[in-house]
């Protein structure tokens, strides 16, 4: 039987700042991906492509119909699956997803994972709003479901999404095939493993209210509050913890209203006291991402990714979609083809070593050092990260105008330099 209990350890936090909340004329997106402790997250670049009409696309568990054209994407993903926990496309659309449990039951059948929906939306959407509709359409056609961890005991949940582009952001929250979405055209917003859309609904599934009424969750009279109607009546302890993280994240964003930068977002993601940077039981923050999406379309979007666990002990490295972008092998996990435990039925009966080169170096360096050596290592990490942030500032102000080829190879260069730090 699949475990669908929200008591199971699982948490994530997504943040977005839309001007005037940002210190600069840019939308700023951030996410911590909290996953099983030993799960490896890789960073994968997928180039744009054109596809044969009517062709099929294999996602984590099921096939879907492919579209004729897909955008280039950068993905931070658990290396055993097809989709992603967070990512961006070449047009400046960013998405992060999170687990959520509602009154709508979680089925045990295999369908699209929330992480598959995320990647499909990035590959197929030119704006955050378009991505909302892509996910809604896929939910309606294929549904969501399947185990979300590499374990013989299935662990299933529904999903919420934070979507952003150069001009605005959207929150999309689902319950089975049903959904509600909220548009954010200014200010700061966060999500943390719970329904957060109340009465301010910008778009919704056409049967959302009639279903709630038929189930006896809503009288059909008065104001319709999505979170109130669809949230579990008795909130388990784990959901209470999510509420605490949500409040803490909200407060941190509010304190920085008007002055939110990439550095502010990184600091929030590194906050351990709130549980946003988590290390609890069998789960921890396995990867993190911060993206700066300038409103000026002539300026490049810059995406910072760690590819390693615990942002407080990791380096945010800049990625830019430009000429000459390639896949750094140091952040790519090994592949196992038909022998992968996710491909053999019943699934996940054995384990394989998915650690990529940067992950191995990062973990080995931190594990072997005493406190003084770790302090020195952290200084080197911070110095490298600051170089990336300085490059961002130079690009945004126009003080730096590197050749496109140099921008395209930026992430590769930072990955190589970080790898050398751990050698």
From Swiss-Prot:
Q: What GO molecular function terms would the record report?
A: cysteine-type exopeptidase activity; dipeptidase activity
The answer to whether UniProt assigns keyword Phosphoprotein to this entry is yes
Q: Which residues carry this modification: Phosphothreonine?
A: 52
Which keywords annotate this record?
Phosphoprotein
User: Which residues are catalytic?
Assistant: 12
Family per UniProt?
Belongs to the peptidase C69 family. Secernin subfamily.
Name-wise, this protein is Secernin-2
Q: Which gene encodes it?
A: Scrn2
């Amino acid at each position: 039987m699949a475990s669908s209990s929200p008591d199971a350890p699982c948490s994530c936090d997504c943040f977005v700042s839309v001007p005037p909340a940002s210190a600069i004329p840019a939308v700023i997106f951030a996410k911590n991906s909290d996953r099983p402790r030993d799960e490896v997250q890789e960073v994968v670049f997928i180039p744009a492509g054109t596809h044969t009409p009517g062709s099929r696309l294999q996602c984590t568990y099921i096939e879907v119909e492919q579209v004729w054209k897909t955008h280039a994407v950068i993905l931070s993903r658990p290396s055993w699956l097809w989709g992603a926990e967070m990512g961006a496309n070449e047009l400046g659309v960013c998405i992060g997803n999170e687990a959520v449990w509602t009154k709508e039951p979680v089925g045990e059948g295999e369908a699209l994972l929330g992480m598959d929906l995320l990647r499909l939306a990035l590959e197929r959407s030119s704006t955050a709003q378009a991505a909302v509709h892509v996910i809604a359409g896929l939910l309606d056609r294929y549904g969501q479901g399947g185990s979300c961890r590499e374990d013989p005991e299935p662990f299933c949940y529904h999903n919420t999404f934070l979507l952003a582009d150069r001009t605005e952001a959207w929150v999309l929250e689902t319950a089975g095939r049903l959904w509600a979405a909220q548009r954010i055209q200014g200010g700061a917003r966060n999500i943390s493993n719970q329904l957060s859309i109340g009465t301010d609904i910008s778009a919704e599934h056409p049967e959302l209210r009639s279903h709630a009424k038929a189930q006896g969750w809503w009288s059909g009279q008065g104001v319709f509050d999505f979170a109130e109607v669809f949230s579990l009546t008795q909130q388990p302890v784990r959901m209470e913890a999510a509420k605490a993280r949500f409040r803490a994240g909200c407060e941190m964003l509010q304190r920085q209203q008007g002055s939110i930068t990439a550095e502010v977002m990184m600091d929030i993601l590194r906050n351990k006291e709130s549980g946003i940077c988590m290390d609890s039981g069998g789960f921890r923050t396995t990867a993190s991402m911060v993206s700066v999406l300038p409103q000026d379309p002539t300026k490049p979007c810059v995406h910072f990714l760690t590819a390693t666990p615990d942002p407080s002990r990791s380096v945010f490295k800049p990625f830019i979609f430009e000429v000459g972008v390639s896949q750094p092998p140091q952040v790519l996990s090994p592949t196992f083809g038909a022998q992968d435990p996710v491909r053999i039925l019943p699934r996940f009966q054995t384990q394989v070593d998915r650690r990529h080169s940067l992950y191995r170096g990062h973990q080995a360096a931190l594990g072997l050092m005493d406190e003084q050596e770790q302090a020195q290592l952290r200084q080197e990490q911070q110095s490298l990260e600051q170089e990336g942030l300085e490059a961002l500032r130079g690009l945004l102000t126009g003080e730096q105008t590197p050749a496109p080829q140099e921008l395209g190879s930026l992430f590769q260069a930072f990955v190589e330099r970080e790898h050398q730090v751990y050698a």
